[in-house]
């Protein structure tokens, strides 16, 4: 059973699709998109956009977490590409103001080229602890 005092700060990495132009808003120099040649549509004629996918996953997670009784606060813009430091600063400022028990969850997917770079493995979960005491850091990393 979820504690209604627990706040989940939800992050979705990279930018999304502009609702008016349908343009992918992660800067071209960063990439974060791949054209797939496997016949699947994905987001735009075979393109897979990390930031758009991350927002779809974050939205679904928020829906399910709210059903479980968690208070969810998205810290990402619906489509603009804000820096990770901006998103964590937002969560830290809100958490300091309200002083509640919280968790920061960041959703990321990688755009891997099926036709040009076949994948032979998968990535797992990473835990990062920032500005916490040793006991808390050890607990989070265990």
Give the predicted meaning of each segment:
Residues 3-8, 43-142:
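Active-site-proximal helix/loop segments of hydrolytic enzymes
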Residues 5-47:
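Short glycine-rich His-centered loop
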